[in-house]
Amino acid sequence: MEKIKVKEIFNNVYSVDFGDGLKRIATKSLVPGKRVYGEKLVYSDSIEYRVWNPNKSKLGAAIINGLKKMPIKKGTKVLYLGASAGTTPSHVADIAENSLVYALEFAPRIMREFIDSCNERKNLIPVLGDANRPQDYSNIVEKVDVIFEDVAQPNQAEILVKNARWFLKENGYAMISIKARSVDVTKNPREIFAEQKKILIEGGFEIVDEINIEPFEKDHMMMVGIWNETKY
């Protein structure tokens, strides 16, 4: 068994040191022995950890790159927009631990993959729906502490504001992975990031952290905001 050093860097998020100088992070396995996307399982003091691959997770990439504000923690209720096959939502569920993570996905085929890979994580609630239409799943999703968005649409920022108005608690947090090329392939990514940030601020968010996630994803920016619509 590999000898590793584990250190908590955020609540329920850990750095794992294999002694090779490479930066790695992990979450405690909510379902020990169960892989979701072929991730490495490691052990320290009889606790199983899932190594979080930043090449397959924008949130993982942001943490590796030095994210300062991580609002997802134990007990946090989360709405995850753009769940895909469940790679990042599975780690978010590990972190939230005893709280619900609503995982929204638009494509039925991908949702089936998500259910197959994550069905043993009882705090992960699959929701089939369109993030542009929060009213369609308002009978399923409760008020949440954090919204995480990874949706490759031209109106990414507007989608976040729309969902925040339906579901985000006052002074709750949102995290959004902005994909510049999904907004406009003709513009400089920096210009797009500034435009999307402006939409978020005008919609009711105070941006408290921004981090580029290259080299893991090209032309992507992670933003973290506090929701206080009444201030704007």
Curated annotation (Swiss-Prot):
This is Fibrillarin-like rRNA/tRNA 2'-O-methyltransferase. Belongs to the methyltransferase superfamily. Fibrillarin family. Involved in pre-rRNA and tRNA processing. Utilizes the methyl donor S-adenosyl-L-methionine to catalyze the site-specific 2'-hydroxyl methylation of ribose moieties in rRNA and tRNA. Site specificity is provided by a guide RNA that base pairs with the substrate. Methylation occurs at a characteristic distance from the sequence involved in base pairing with the guide RNA. GO terms for molecular function: histone H2AQ104 methyltransferase activity; RNA binding; rRNA methyltransferase activity. SMART domains: Fibrillarin. The gene is flpA. InterPro entries: Fibrillarin, Fibrillarin_CS, SAM-dependent_MTases_sf. PANTHER family: FIBRILLARIN, RRNA 2-O-METHYLTRANSFERASE FIBRILLARIN. The keyword RNA-binding applies. Its EC number is 2.1.1.-. One of its GO terms (biological process) is tRNA processing. It comes from Methanococcus maripaludis (strain C7 / ATCC BAA-1331).
